[in-house]
């Protein structure tokens, strides 16, 4: 596809650079708009970006474009997720609650990497891992829509 080392470094650099921009942008938007809609949009956009990437013919420009787009979307879920969890459940146990969110994220990361390798070993391609990523992105985008952005009642202690 391209000179591997140079192209890989460029893609990783774009992911890192645009990750900053995406996180700052989503944090700003989370102060102004519905957090569940921001999250839904981000997850659906991830699925779209992955679909575009795997269905276009491979080239260095496509790979760098994917790095830019996916970098922008990569950790942009963190600010609205933190804001939503903090708003709904309050901040008293925010560390524990976000720890649970982050743990589930890490389990998903492990499964994505591991199953990608399993699919490659079984089928000689990562295609099925990409297809599942698209489906899970769509699922994540849709599952956020019914979230009710309302604080849960607090138990008063004396």
Locate the predicted segments by residue.
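Short, small-residue-biased leader/transition segments that mark boundaries at the very start
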Residues: 1-3
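Loop-to-transmembrane helix entry/capping segments in MFS-fold secondary transporters
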Residues: 5-6, 91-101
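C-terminal transmembrane helical hairpin of 12-TM major facilitator-type secondary transporters
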Residues: 7, 13-19, 25, 32-84
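Small/hydrophobic positions within alpha-helical transmembrane segments
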Residues: 14, 18, 45, 69, ...
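Conserved kink/hinge residues within transmembrane alpha-helices of Major Facilitator Superfamily
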Residues: 23-27, 113, 144
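Interfacial helix-cap and linker-helix signal at transmembrane-aqueous boundaries
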Residues: 29-30, 115-124
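Paired intracellular helix-loop junctions of major facilitator superfamily
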Residues: 85-94, 124
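Multi-pass alpha-helical transporter architecture, strongest
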Residues: 134-158
């Amino acid at each position: 596809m391209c000179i591997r080392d140079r192209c890989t470094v460029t893609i990783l650099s774009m992911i890192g650079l645009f990750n900053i921009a995406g996180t700052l942008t989503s944090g700003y938007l989370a102060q102004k708009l519905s957090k569940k809609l921001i999250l839904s949009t981000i997850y659906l956009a991830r699925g779209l970006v992955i679909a575009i990437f795997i269905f276009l013919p491979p080239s260095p420009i496509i790979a760098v474009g994917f790095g830019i787009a996916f970098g922008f979307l990569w950790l942009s879920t963190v600010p609205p997720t933190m804001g939503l969890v903090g708003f709904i459940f309050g901040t008293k146990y925010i560390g524990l609650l976000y720890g649970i969110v982050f743990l589930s994220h890490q389990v998903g990361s492990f499964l994505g990497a591991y199953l990608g390798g399993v699919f490659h070993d079984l089928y000689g391609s990562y295609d099925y891992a990409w297809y599942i990523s698209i489906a899970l992105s769509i699922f994540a985008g849709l599952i956020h829509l019914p979230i009710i952005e309302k604080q849960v009642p607090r138990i008063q202690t004396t």
